[in-house]
């Protein structure tokens, strides 16, 4: 089936292009467009740190046993670089268009040579009060190589020309300045002029301040060019048997900071001699690694572009809705025992879930709390509630994944805090990331479980669309408890009747559910599959979906990211359609619905259809029996499939065409529905 499987990394590039498209849309508020540029750039940086680094390692490997993989990696790298070059041109044009439109709206970006006297005075004062001491140049003539200078930072390469009256040519020196953007932020608001808000890149602030930075070095003129380099994010894990898990991960994070440069982006107006010196100091000699760019790098900072108080240039805010039935004076744990409850963040407030943990921490009815944690907020209310529970005499067990990429240091910090408070901290199973989102609360009056699709992270809950189901159904709660037992004793065989749990049972059960739809289609029964998911790259699942399509099963997919499946191929996948939504919220929930001959089966949980989720992680999908939640899951998928404003057709070729039809924005309609339902429930409760 040639052309029926898309390489995951090419598919990812198509996904990220959908984000760039959102920045290009004229009907999107201008500051939101600026933010989408930042998101696009941030995604690309992480992609190069992780996926391109992995492909490069394979392509450069001397292992004779992976010749086929090596050739495939080289081919993929070439295709990605071609796509990236095309998308970069689009990106630069979008930056210019948005900057021009911003100026029409009264927000202007200034260069260092465009400042009036008041603004120059402001910049000089800023340098003396905040920047002085944070900008320490390194003379390239005095170093043989640029050492471990961190990752993903921006540098200014400075050409300094010192003039002497008795010489016709200046003495030329080159220096590097690491941008202090982590401390200062990337943008500086200047005093207004001509009724305009004025913004300046920190890069240009430093350009203006170069004579002050090099003061005492004699009369000179300066040129400065930005560049950045991205490093391989792979961690080298210590195999020392005497090291604990936490120590190994901490060493691994440290090794990442001195990883090999994967990509260097430089200002294309930089003199060749200066670029050559930088490449020499970085020990880079392959042209594939070097990418020319514009005046500014690290466009991910556009996510934090100053809004100057201009809410009119952003989408209206959707305030998270408090579900009235979860906000009564009644115990929330008792409310869950009456009926399955759920929240769908960010539409609903994450505080309802925090209330569950806080009540469990204080209630004398609660004996123990078990939780899986993958990523956590900086000031995590989840952790604070768990510490409170431990201090109130509950047995609290936390399974924390130390290898959550780029959150390793944060998770080490939280692990120590939890241990200091008397919480039992388990670091999971070697070789298996724990990605499931579970809570088990042991109570005298009846146990409770929470199963989610996303992280227990207050920050994520403001941006990522995720479900959290809270239940007291004994058959599900018992099995959630069994998952925690499996994590603590992973070599003990465990069977699950209700939950779909990887790495042992989830994949075969999903394949069986698809096969059941094929059988129903052949018997003339109702047969269809609706899926909302982040990624589909598992070859066995893709092949089974193709079989189902050929058997007459209609398959509708709402997908955010990687999609190796190609919908609409004659004789292969003509019964499969897929769309991807890019909007205010990041689509993150995983939902599966199978027609089951007219008696649909519903599932939600943490797993995508990728080998890593189905084989290399502990993931959990739960069946959903509550009719209200079933209706909500189906509505979410159906609205997404109908979306004509923010959904693109996923076709395996990266065309990302918009759907036809009357304007319909699924996220907006969901919020309107939830708001109406909340008001109606309030009326019922207050009668």
Q: Which ranges hold each PLM region?
A:
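N-terminal localization/anchoring segments of enzymes in phospholipid and broader phosphate metabolism
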Residues: 1-529, 547, 551, 563-585, ...
């Amino acid at each position: 089936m040639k052309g029926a499987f898309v390489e995951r990394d090419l598919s990812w590039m198509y996904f990220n292009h959908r984000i760039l498209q959102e920045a290009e849309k004229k009907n999107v508020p201008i500051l939101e467009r600026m933010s989408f540029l930042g998101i696009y750039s941030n995604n690309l940086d992480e992609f190069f740190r992780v996926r391109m680094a992995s492909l490069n390692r394979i392509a450069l490997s001397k292992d004779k046993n992976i010749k086929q993989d090596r050739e495939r990696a080289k081919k993929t790298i070439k295709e990605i670089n071609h796509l990236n070059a095309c998308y970069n041109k689009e990106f630069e044009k979008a930056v210019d268009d948005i900057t021009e439109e911003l100026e029409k709206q009264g927000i202007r970006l200034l260069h260092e040579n465009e400042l009036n006297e008041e603004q120059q005075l402001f910049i000089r004062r800023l340098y003396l009060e905040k920047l002085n001491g944070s900008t320490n140049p390194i003379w390239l003539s005095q170093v043989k190589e640029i050492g471990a200078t961190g990752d993903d930072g921006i540098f200014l390469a400075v050409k300094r020309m010192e003039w002497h009256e008795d010489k016709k040519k200046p003495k030329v020196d080159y220096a590097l300045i690491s941008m202090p953007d982590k401390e200062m932020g990337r943008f500086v608001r200047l005093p207004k002029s001509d009724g305009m808000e004025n913004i300046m890149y920190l890069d240009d602030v430093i350009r203006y301040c170069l004579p002050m930075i090099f003061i005492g070095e004699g009369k000179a003129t300066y040129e400065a060019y930005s560049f950045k380099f991205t490093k391989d994010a792979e961690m080298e894990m210590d195999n020392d048997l005497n090291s604990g898990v936490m120590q190994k991960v901490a060493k691994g994070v440290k090794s990442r900071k001195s990883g090999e440069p994967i990509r260097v982006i430089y200002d294309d107006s930089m003199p060749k001699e200066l670029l050559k010196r930088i490449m020499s100091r970085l020990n880079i000699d392959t042209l594939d690694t070097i990418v020319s760019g514009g005046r500014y790098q690290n466009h991910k900072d556009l996510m934090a572009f100053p809004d100057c108080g201009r809410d009119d240039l952003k989408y209206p805010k959707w305030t998270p809705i408090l579900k009235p039935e979860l906000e009564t004076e009644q115990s929330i744990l008792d409310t869950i025992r009456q009926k399955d409850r759920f929240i769908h963040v960010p539409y609903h407030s994450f505080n309802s879930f925090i209330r569950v943990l806080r009540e469990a921490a204080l209630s004398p009815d609660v004996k123990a709390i078990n939780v899986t944690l993958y990523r956590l907020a900086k000031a995590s209310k989840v952790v604070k509630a768990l510490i409170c529970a431990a201090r109130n005499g509950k047995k609290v067990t936390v399974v924390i994944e130390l290898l959550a990429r780029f959150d390793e240091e944060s998770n080490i910090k939280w692990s120590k805090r939890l241990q200091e408070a008397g919480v039992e901290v388990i670091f999971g199973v070697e070789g298996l990331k724990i990605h499931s989102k579970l809570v088990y609360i042991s109570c005298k009056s009846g146990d409770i479980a929470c199963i989610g699709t996303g992280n227990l992270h207050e920050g994520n809950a403001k941006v990522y669309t995720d479900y959290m189901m809270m239940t007291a159904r004994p058959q599900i709660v018992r099995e959630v408890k069994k998952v925690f037992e499996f994590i603590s004793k992973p070599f003990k065989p465990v069977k699950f009747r209700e939950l779909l749990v990887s790495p042992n049972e989830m994949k075969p059960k999903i394949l069986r559910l698809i096969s059941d739809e094929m059988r129903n289609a052949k018997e003339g029964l109702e047969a269809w599959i609706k899926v909302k998911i982040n990624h589909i790259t598992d070859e066995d699942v893709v092949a089974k979906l193709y079989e189902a399509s050929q058997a007459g099963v209609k398959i509708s997919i709402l997908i955010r990211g990687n999609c190796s499946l190609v919908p609409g191929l004659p004789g292969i996948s003509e019964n499969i359609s897929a769309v991807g939504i890019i909007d205010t919220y990041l689509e993150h929930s995983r939902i599966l619905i199978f027609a089951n001959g007219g008696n649909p089966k519903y599932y939600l949980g943490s797993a995508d259809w990728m080998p890593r989720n189905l084989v290399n992680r502990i993931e959990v999908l739960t069946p959903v029996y509550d009719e209200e939640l079933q209706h909500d899951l189906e509505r979410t998928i159906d609205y997404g499939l109908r979306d004509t404003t923010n959904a693109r057709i996923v076709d395996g070729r990266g065309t990302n065409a918009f759907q036809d039809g009357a304007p319909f924005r699924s996220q907006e309609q969901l919020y309107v529905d939830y708001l109406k339902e909340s008001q109606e429930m309030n009326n019922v409760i207050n009668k």
